[in-house]
Amino acid sequence: MAAFVGLPLRSVPMLLLLLLLVVAGTARGETLYGPEDSVTILNKESVARAVFNSSSAWLLEFYSSWCGHCINYAPTWKALARDVRDWEPAIKIGVLDCAEEDNYGACKDFGVTLYPTFRFFKAFTKEFTQGENYKAVGDREIQTVRQVIIDFLQTSPAESKPQAWPSLEPISSSEISSLLTPKQSHYTAIIFESEESYEGREVILDLIQYSNIVVRRALPSDKPILEKLGIGSVPSCYLIQPNGLHGLINDVKSIRSQLSLHLKALSNVRKLLPSETAHSGLSKGVQQEDTTMNQFDRSKLYMTDLESGLHYILRAELANHHTLEGEKLKTFKDFVTILYKLFPGRPHVMKLLETLQEWLVSMPLDTIPYDAILDLVNNKMRISGIFLTNHTQWVGCRGSKSNLRGYPCSLWKLFHSLTVQAAVKPDALANTAFEAEPRAVLQTMRRYIREFFGCRECAKHFEAMAKETVDSVKTPDQAILWLWRKHNVVNNRLSGAPSEDPKFPKVQWPTSDLCSACHSQTGGVHSWNEDEVLAFLKRYYGNQEISLEFADPRKDLSEAATDNGNKEPHFTKKPQERDYVKKQNPQFLDKLVQKKPEKSLDSEAAESSQSVSFLGIGFSNIDMSLCVILYVTSSLFLMIMFFFFRFRSKRWKVRYNRPFV
């Protein structure tokens, strides 16, 4: 307060307001890319305006800021963007973070299910398209990606090539001869190289934004012209000056790295215009450390971490799949069954899982649109007592920056909890396909990660790890310890990696402050007391130890009364509406329910329990409709049978009472 001494009293509120703004600014979410990088940072609103009907092609990286492989690859992608920033009139490099909740719908509409995903978009694209997948035979290193970019540009149709684009095709010997005779107003550099070489085309694109110079490439197929110009080997560069002088450039050893700089340094060669700012109004701001992180007890498991992870799974990761079929559908059904039977959730979440599981069992379909599942998850049928938080709120899984920890941490905690619940509730999976199967949770986790987990490299690592030893698990307790061991293996592998949170280092867990009895020393060598570890894991992930702190049920009830978690927009596919706007999801389940006029949120929330819960037993509108249909059908059937037998009985009476003559 001493800082305010001597200030006019009316100035203090203004200073406090400025202080709040500064604090709010430091708490902004991080992404892997910032305005200092040479990439265009896109979001749900800007991606359509940038990509479609653009005069340049685009190469986009769809990534997730929590994905370890994306974090590791970010420096390479930044270096690529810097390396080809002069190519912007031909192609631009962009990124879109699919971990941002506002971008869920965008990534779904572009069909992104794995991270990172790379897509090419042609110039002058008018209709909505999901782009062309990056196809690299080898790696994703800078040189490889540059060559794939050139192949994409060179094979683009004529209507996707602006007149300003340079020609990447080789010129003929006659064209070379015509360039040697008259004086020209600009420099002409001819790069002789083999047909499979990319260096000449890279230099052409490097000089695309520079005036007073034209760069072409030629093949060494015409021996006489090579002898005439004194070219003895390739690659070589022949420079024709505006004054008519021409000759080989001999002081350049490497075509791409040095020749581009040499040509840019020629007299009167100037850059036409500075590159457009790639991120004006698009970037999220410079990454800063989140100093407002809640203080939490590391010895506790928080329900909000589990429910936030479940929200992300059902509304983001799985929602990226437009339909579920085959092995994906089977995996999803088994995953929901495991959740319904073992998830240590609160009643309203468990009722949602129960409803979802029963609905899936009752659907004898080989293909299910995920929008139908979303309608149920978002409780479009307004079944009372069903809701799931519609946002992520990390507590024990919160990192020092918003792109660290989060969902992967929550997924580990979720499956640790499920393995413990399977052990302490041995009859929970009775009368299911997993009855008496000690590896039920592990195999379901393995299949889920293989089919749905967004980080493809992480999924490959886990699959390789599970393939080796998971079959050795014979009891539920062994399943608990197997997952604990493998989690520590992953922690050891990722220790010191770019994806590691410096405030939460990857260590062998549980640490001695959480469970001193779990650790022992034999001859100065550390070892685990696995009996104590097992007991600790059962306590830590048991129902009694899950903290409901930060999980306010009243807050969740207010969410259920509004939109039940349905807040993700969808992409409008019409060319004239290429922005992300608020639209209702396809109401697959609502087609069976009579539409009601819109009401205020207060009246809607007040009526929801009355209109849905019939006689207190939780019948939905669909249930009531089916009951009415069954009642009417049964009544009609009974009436038909009544008249049928009555008619027959009359015929019998007439026959028996007929007088004999």
Swiss-Prot record:
Q: How is the cofactor bound?
A: Binds 1 FAD per subunit.
**A single GO molecular function term of this UniProt record:** protein disulfide isomerase activity
Its signal peptide is 1-29
Q: What is this protein called?
A: Sulfhydryl oxidase 2
Cellular component, GO annotation: extracellular space; Golgi membrane
One GO BP: protein folding
Residues annotated as glycosylated:
53, 390
Report the SS bond pairs: 67-70, 98-107, 397-409, 455-458, 515-518
Family that this chain belongs to? Belongs to the quiescin-sulfhydryl oxidase (QSOX) family.
Alphabetically sorted, this entry's keywords are: Disulfide bond, FAD, Flavoprotein, Glycoprotein, Membrane, Oxidoreductase, Signal, Transmembrane, Transmembrane helix
Q: Where is the Thioredoxin domain?
A: 30-155
